[in-house]
Amino acid sequence: MNAEIIAVGTELLLGQIANTNAQFLSEKLASIGINVYYHTVVGDNNKRLQQAIEVAEERADMLIFTGGLGPTKDDLTKETIASSLAEELVYDEKALASISDYFKRTGREFTENNKKQALVLDGATVFANDHGMAPGMGLNKNGKVYILLPGPPKEMKPMYVSYVEPFLRNFTTGENIYSRVLRFFGIGESQLEVKVQDLIDGQTNPTIAPLANDGEVTLRLTAKHQNVDEAEKLIQHVEDLILERVGGFFYGYDQEFLHDKAIVLLKKKGLTLACAESLTGGLFGNQVTESAGVSSVFKGGVICYHNDVKQHVLHVPEEVLFTDGAVSKECARYLAENVKELLEADIGISFTGVAGPDASEHKEPGTVFVGLAIKDEPTVVFPLNLSGSRQQIRERSAKYGFYHLYKKLEEI
């Protein structure tokens, strides 16, 4: 079954709020075998909403609406659909009682326009709103399925999970969609795609979809099958083929992120970490502390933005700063080694570079050095040549720090 999601609300068109409902619904619908081929956003206008309905009816089996179920005059979704389908709007007694009870409990006047929220399409299946007032509804008519949901995500999402998805399963074939995301770092999207292009072109089940984001690349493997075990086998076979070619850049699955993976390895190996941040200005340390229980492995950090701090706190020799510069391999080495000693950690990591937009020390923006000093191991400095905005260079530098830390921890 093919679906179209129609988000109703002028505030969406104006960019005042993001359409997170469409993302949530697309993912949920895909998981039960409903294909979403179109996303439409339309303002609070009866004529334009009617046009959107007519277009969607030509190309989709299921029309899913979010928004426009509230009490105000510009909440037109129910009225427009009722007119389009020649259906009456009737009061749902349970919803009306629930709304009335809310106003009594809060001591507010139950105005006539608020009763409007209890109106539903005659003959529709009503979805209770456990987190708001306006109920949702589903109606199967003229070979099409119409789903109406409230706009606020805090109301729509729990309604979907509790009531809408069980209703929708009546219209699916039983074939479900299963996905697995493979995460890679240290290789560009184009480089990775070249290495697996024949697999991307040749696969229909599962499919392979590459996506680049903030310096890393993901491959989403998606399989369709009625049986979860068979779907897992399909995905695993393709994953094995991919990792044979680019496994050296692979670091995790789905919602596993570099900083979490590095922290897990630190805990597993019983090692402690300290950081010296010039270029990144605390970004690395901030991401470290996003992980729960990290105090057992993270000693702390020094933000050494000014050369005085590099020299007098982290003891980078004056001649290094004068001759090689703060943005140099030598400076990164001293910073990593000395922050390790200063904070009595097993590992020291450092970041120095040029974030831009202007050059510094005759070095171009994106020139970065990441130092890594590990006890009983030779210090390593990783030179980077990054592109992007000032913020992107800083964020990608921190991510490269986690990547190199993770890879070194895997080796020792």
From Swiss-Prot:
<dbReference type="Pfam" id="PF18146">
    <property type="entry name" value="CinA_KH"/>
</dbReference>
<dbReference type="InterPro" id="IPR001453">
    <property type="entry name" value="MoaB/Mog_dom"/>
</dbReference>
<dbReference type="InterPro" id="IPR050101">
    <property type="entry name" value="CinA"/>
</dbReference>
<dbReference type="InterPro" id="IPR008135">
    <property type="entry name" value="Competence-induced_CinA"/>
</dbReference>
<dbReference type="InterPro" id="IPR041424">
    <property type="entry name" value="CinA_KH"/>
</dbReference>
<dbReference type="Pfam" id="PF02464">
    <property type="entry name" value="CinA"/>
</dbReference>
<protein>
    <recommendedName>
        <fullName>Putative competence-damage inducible protein</fullName>
    </recommendedName>
</protein>
<dbReference type="InterPro" id="IPR036425">
    <property type="entry name" value="MoaB/Mog-like_dom_sf"/>
</dbReference>
<dbReference type="InterPro" id="IPR008136">
    <property type="entry name" value="CinA_C"/>
</dbReference>
<dbReference type="Pfam" id="PF00994">
    <property type="entry name" value="MoCF_biosynth"/>
</dbReference>
<dbReference type="InterPro" id="IPR036653">
    <property type="entry name" value="CinA-like_C"/>
</dbReference>
<comment type="similarity">
    <text>Belongs to the CinA family.</text>
</comment>
